[in-house]
Structure formats: structure tokens, C-alpha cells
């Protein structure tokens, strides 16, 4: 393979796309976790003044939101592991790593937003009707799975570049 053909498949800007995917995975998934934590935390602090004994049971949305940032961290570590200053980095790998980061990032952002909305209203209604707890947890699980789907797609995409 000639140098000009190698430069065509591994241009100098290709690693930028990989770094952008790494950053997008962390930034967007942590933003989703922060939104979910903030929105559900507002509801928890609201019920804490009336029924402090319900605070520990109401922390489930906050914990579920925190897990979203772990999804972004896992994908970011995998992307960073594929970046090397001594090896050629193809344009395909750059776009693939960008797609990995955006996939998990936007999925976790949407998941965090939905966890925040359900968590906020759920804990407020749980204060009035404790029988709603199981239904709220099920809805939170379905909202959490959205972020997991993004991570699964990112992992599948990442294996395409290493295989």
C-alpha cells in the first residue's frame, strides 16, 4: 500500500473523531445522570419535609440516574483503549468511535431525563399512596433500560473496529 493510499484511509484528523466520541460518551451520559438526579432530588427533598421516613425508599431514582454515568464511562474507556499515538488510526475507526460515543451519550441523556421526570412525580405520589411503589420502580426500570440499549449498541459497534 502506498503512502498516499494510507493517508487516505488514516488521515491526520481521524483521531479527533475518536476523541470526540470518547468525550461525547462521558459528557452526554453524565448530563443525563445529572438531570435525573436533580429532577428526582427535587421530589425527594419535597417529601422529606413531610415524611422523613420515606427518604431512603425514595433514593432509587437517584441511584438509577448515577448508573447512567457508568455506562458512559465504560464506553469511554473502551474508545480510549482503541486510540494509540504510535499506530495508524483509520477514518473508519474514527467514525465508529464517534458513533459509539453518541449512541451511549444520547441514550443516557434521554434515559436520565425520563428517570428524573418519573422519579420526581413518583416519589411525590408515593408519599400519598404507598402502594404505587412497585409500579414506580417498574417504570424507572424501563426508563433505565433506554441507557442500557445505547451502551449495548456502542459495544457492538466497538467490536466491529477491533475485529
Swiss-Prot record:
Gene Ontology cellular component list: fungal-type vacuole; vacuolar proton-transporting V-type ATPase, V0 domain
Compartments it resides in: Vacuole membrane
Domain of life: Eukaryota
MF GO annotations: proton-transporting ATPase activity, rotational mechanism
Ranges facing Lumenal side: 1-15, 80-97, 157-163
Alphabetical keyword list: Hydrogen ion transport, Ion transport, Membrane, Transmembrane, Transmembrane helix, Transport, Vacuole
CDD domains: ATP-synt_Vo_c_ATP6C_rpt1, ATP-synt_Vo_c_ATP6C_rpt2
Record family assignment: Belongs to the V-ATPase proteolipid subunit family.
Subunit structure, interactors included: V-ATPase is a heteromultimeric enzyme composed of a peripheral catalytic V1 complex (components A to H) attached to an integral membrane V0 proton pore complex (components: a, c, c', c'', d, e, f and VOA1). The decameric c-ring forms the proton-conducting pore, and is composed of eight proteolipid subunits c, one subunit c' and one subunit c''.
Protein name (Swiss-Prot/TrEMBL): V-type proton ATPase subunit c'
Lineage, highest ranks first: Eukaryota, Fungi, Dikarya, Ascomycota, Saccharomycotina
Underlying gene: VMA11
Amino acid at each position: 500500500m502506498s503512502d498516499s493510499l494510507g493517508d487516505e484511509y488514516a488521515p491526520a484528523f481521524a483521531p479527533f473523531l475518536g476523541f470526540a466520541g470518547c468525550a461525547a460518551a462521558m459528557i452526554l451520559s453524565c448530563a443525563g445522570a445529572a438531570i435525573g438526579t436533580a429532577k428526582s432530588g427535587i421530589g425527594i427533598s419535597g417529601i422529606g419535609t413531610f415524611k422523613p421516613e420515606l427518604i431512603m425508599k425514595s433514593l432509587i431514582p437517584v441511584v438509577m440516574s448515577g448508573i447512567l454515568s457508568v455506562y458512559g464511562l465504560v464506553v469511554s474507556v473502551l474508545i480510549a483503549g482503541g486510540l494509540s499515538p504510535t499506530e495508524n488510526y483509520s477514518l473508519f475507526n474514527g467514525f465508529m468511535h464517534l458513533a459509539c460515543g453518541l449512541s451511549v451519550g444520547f441514550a443516557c441523556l434521554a434515559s436520565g431525563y425520563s428517570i428524573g421526570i418519573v422519579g420526581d412525580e413518583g416519589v411525590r405520589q408515593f408519599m400519598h399512596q404507598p402502594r404505587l411503589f412497585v409500579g414506580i420502580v417498574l417504570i424507572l426500570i424501563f426508563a433505565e433500560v433506554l441507557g442500557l440499549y445505547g451502551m449495548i449498541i456502542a459495544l457492538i459497534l466497538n467490536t466491529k473496529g477491533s475485529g
